[in-house]
Design a protein with these regions (language model features):
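Beta-rich, aromatic/charged-enriched effector core domains that present basic-aromatic interfaces
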Residues: 1-89
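Conserved catalytic cores of very large enzyme subunits
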Residues: 92
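Gly/Thr-rich phosphate-binding loop signature of adenosyl cofactor/nucleotide-binding cores
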Residues: 96-101, 105-226, 241
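Alpha-helical support elements that line or immediately flank enzyme active sites
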Residues: 235-239
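Conserved, aromatic- and glycine-enriched, well-ordered alpha/beta core segments
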Residues: 241-251
């Protein structure tokens, strides 16, 4: 409010102040650790031997209702991209809470350090895998942020990791949601770079010689999931450089 342009960083800092998230100082108006973000500490790459022992993600055997829906989708949308044979996402509140706690306990401590890192054949790494549960209202963003902050105060996760994760939720997720409610439906039709190329057909198959794109697309088709850095810096960035018409990416 009152600014000439929309920027996530302004929104993020205001939300931190308003809700008292990772704030300190006598008046509670200073960022914990003396800085608003820890991007410099959160850009490490894996060594030559790879990510090592990454904790297994929480998986859930599809129940009867989920199996029924899977069968329906396979019958009615058989020609659509993607597969359902490895579906193991949380579909209940209880399962979502298990996924959240597993992330906090096992992957949050290293999330920040490696949040921008990728490795071939490793779709899960130290990410939370909670986006679907949040979007389906199985988890509340406020409670997710609170649990992560509590882990920091308990000494179970370092500040750079917790701040990096909080920024993904309270920053990016809520910022984009805010843009949706303030600028849609017109925002969906914007094309500031006047881009008009078609999205390559192999985006729907993963059949490309470009390794990073192939890996990101293949896991998206297999699991319905790609982490934020794959979407931003691999599939999204390539489409941007190619000049793809925006609606072909998000339609």
């Amino acid at each position: 409010r009152g600014r000439k342009s929309l920027r996530m960083e302004y929104f993020y800092r205001e939300m931190r102040k308003r809700h008292g998230v990772l704030m300190s100082g006598e008046r509670g108006d200073a960022p914990e650790g003396g800085q608003w973000n820890f991007d410099e500490e959160n850009r490490e790459a894996f060594g030559s031997t790879g990510p090592g022992g990454v904790p297994a993600r929480a998986v859930f055997e599809p129940d009867a209702l989920t199996r029924e829906v899977i069968a329906l989708v396979e019958a009615r949308f058989a020609t659509h991209p993607g597969r359902l044979d490895s579906f193991a996402w949380p579909v209940t509140r209880e399962q979502a809470l298990v996924s959240l706690q597993r992330f906090i306990n096992e992957r949050l401590p290293l999330f920040g350090r490696y949040q921008d890192a990728m490795w071939p054949g490793e779709p899960w790494l130290h990410h939370s895998h909670l986006a679907a549960a949040l979007n389906l209202k199985l988890l509340n963003p406020r409670e997710v942020v609170a649990v992560a902050v509590a882990a920091y105060h308990a000494g179970a996760a370092p500040l750079p990791s917790v701040e990096g994760f909080v920024r993904q939720i309270l920053g990016w997720r809520e910022y984009v949601r805010g843009i949706y409610w303030t600028r849609m439906p017109g925002y969906a039709g914007l094309n500031a770079l006047d881009a008009h190329e078609d999205l390559p057909a192999w985006y729907w198959t993963g059949a490309t010689d470009m390794a990073c794109l192939r890996d990101a697309l293949a896991q998206t088709l297999a699991h319905g999931y790609a982490n934020h850095i794959q979407r931003l810096m691999v599939t999204g960035l390539y489409a941007l450089m190619l000049g793809v018409q925006p609606k072909q990416v998000h339609a």
